[in-house]
């Protein structure tokens, strides 16, 4: 960890700013963010307002290749998930501007959603190492999910998120639930820390790296993003009443106290399903089952408030 404020750290001489202007508040935040970061003393050497989110990975990769000491990225959880592959296991830290709908990654790291305070955090915070999840060859920050969570990702249109913000998550969940069909799953644990598990009728499997995901849902009361483990919740299929019970459990972190769920903490898991199911990582459908998921320990350098202690 660095104990010198970032803006006065002599090792930070080149800073790139990359903003997804298609994120919920990205278009109106870009110019103000540039002004604030420079005002706080950060040496911004390149700035990229991107209207095409597909250009985010290549732009961040170029910023790293050009020798920047810090990459500041503005956007939501989908933006962060799309660029962590470029920064994983690299020496270049990430500065975060939460400009999305849910901003669960920022919530886990205690980064303020207020733009000025977020810029202040980048300038005066500290650099820490956190874990990433790994689904196949794809890194993710918050959660991978199979089942209802993947269906919610399909139902979460950019227009819906722009229009109603965080309310888009419960609306999309209800829409997805009506079309959801139960599925069979088998979970195996390569490290032998749990016995293989088979489930004939599931609603969802979640494999969480961060503490928060899905618009403020809590993986577990004691979960953290730097604990070198994944938190897995397996949700049995049920009716509307069971869905409400599960939603409440996720919201307050007490899902373990319901009969609808099983919980596992591990470093690696293999998930097989019938039928073959899409895998959603942080709102993007990137693969299908069978899928191997694991934790990438200390994979990302990121700036957090100086008061941040751990992932809780």
Predicted regions and their residues:
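Catalytic core of DAGKc-family lipid kinases
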Residues: 18, 28, 39-40, 50, ...
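Gly/Ser/Thr-rich active-site loops/lids in small-molecule metabolic enzymes
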Residues: 158-168, 221-242
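Short Gly/Thr/Asp-enriched flexible loops that form oxyanion-binding sites at enzyme active sites
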Residues: 79-92
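N-terminal glycine-rich "phosphate-gripper" loop used for MgATP/nucleotide binding
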Residues: 73-77
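Glycine-rich phosphate/pyrophosphate-binding beta-alpha loops
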Residues: 145, 149, 206-221, 285
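ATP/nucleoside-binding phosphotransfer catalytic cores, i.e., glycine-rich phosphate-binding loops
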Residues: 2-4, 191, 199, 224, ...
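ATP/NTP phosphate-donor binding region
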Residues: 1-71, 81, 309-312
């Amino acid at each position: 960890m660095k104990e010198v404020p970032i803006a006065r750290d002599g090792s930070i001489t080149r800073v790139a700013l990359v903003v997804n202007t298609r994120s919920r508040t990205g278009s109106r935040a870009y110019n103000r963010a540039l002004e604030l970061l420079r005002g706080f003393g950060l040496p911004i050497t390149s700035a990229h307002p991107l209207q095409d989110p597909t250009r985010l990975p290549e732009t961040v990769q170029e910023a790293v290749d050009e020798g920047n000491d810090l990459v500041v990225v503005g956007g939501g959880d989908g933006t962060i998930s799309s660029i962590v592959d470029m920064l994983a296991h690299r020496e270049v830290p990430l500065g975060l501007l939460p400009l999305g709908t849910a901003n669960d990654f920022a919530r886990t790291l205690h980064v303020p959603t207020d733009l000025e305070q977020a810029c202040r955090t980048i300038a005066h915070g500290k650099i820490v190492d956190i874990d990433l999840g790994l689904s196949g060859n794809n890194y993710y920050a918050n959660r991978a999910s199979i089942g209802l969570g993947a269906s919610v990702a399909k139902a979460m249109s950019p227009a819906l998120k722009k229009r109603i913000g965080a309310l888009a998550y419960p609306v999309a969940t209800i829409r997805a639930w009506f079309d959801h069909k139960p599925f069979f799953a088998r979970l195996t644990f390569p490290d032998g820390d749990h016995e293989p598990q088979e489930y004939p009728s599931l609603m969802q499997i979640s494999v969480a790296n961060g503490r928060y995901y899905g618009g403020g849902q809590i993986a577990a009361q004691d979960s953290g993003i730097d604990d070198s483990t994944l938190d897995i919740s397996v949700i049995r299929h049920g009716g509307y009443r069971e869905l409400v019970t599960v939603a409440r459990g996720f919201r307050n972190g007490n899902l373990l106290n319901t009969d609808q769920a099983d919980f596992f903490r591990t470093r690696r898991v293999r998930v097989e399903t019938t039928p073959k199911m899409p895998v959603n990582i942080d709102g993007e459908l990137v693969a299908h089952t069978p899928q191997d998921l694991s934790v990438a320990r200390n994979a990302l350098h990121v700036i957090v408030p100086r008061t941040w202690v751990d992932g809780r």
